[in-house]
Swiss-Prot record:
This is 1-(5-phosphoribosyl)-5-[(5-phosphoribosylamino)methylideneamino] imidazole-4-carboxamide isomerase. GO terms for cellular component: cytoplasm. It is found in: Cytoplasm. GO terms for molecular function: 1-(5-phosphoribosyl)-5-[(5-phosphoribosylamino)methylideneamino]imidazole-4-carboxamide isomerase activity. It comes from Carboxydothermus hydrogenoformans (strain ATCC BAA-161 / DSM 6008 / Z-2901).
Amino acid sequence: MILIPAIDLMGKKVVRLTQGEKERKTEYPISPVELALKYQEAGARLIHVVDLDRAFTGESENFEVIAEIIKNVSIPVQVGGGIRDIESFRELIDLGVSRVIVGTIAVTNPELLEEMLTLDRDKVAVGIDAKNGWVAIKGWVESSNYRALDLAYKVKEMGVTTIIYTDIARDGSLTGPNFNETLKLAIDTGLKVIASGGISGLEDLRRWRELGENKIYGVIAGKAILEGKIDLKEGIRILEGES
């Protein structure tokens, strides 16, 4: 199991939202590239980047920032947020992104997801963002008619092997992860699941280590690292088995 630090981008700046709400935004006085380098130096093996502008509006002003992050670090970078056309997918692949995370199109345009899988199956992951078990789309502002588990089974049939599961109610809240729902998704589907949302401190990582060993591929943490609730080096040691 690996600990994956997150960088959320809005207006070329590092931010965190609480429960995905634009109005509940915290800005951090560090450049995205500087933060990525700090994460790499602490021992991260993968960085998770979310383009919030594109998620909300479909337009991105963060492309150059993402390019700079990839240019400056030597570890893989996965990117998500509002990728709803094949051109955006190609652009990110050409940039050197290790994995592109799509969400909304898995619900609204499965044909496009098929096209992406045909282009480069290994570079596609699906983000399943759920509130009370129901999948939310378009930057979490709309609800869908899919239960999280049903969507996971559907994309698995299409050939997706990796999903990022976020419990929206926990995201950016520092209230602790939804262990049960995430584990159920991983065990029932057999997919490679990355857990996201709610990490509040090292105790949550110890719990993931205890419950998720050989079931969960990775855990994403953002706000807890930025606000000093988790020392990234120590978190990596706990989750990856050195303490």
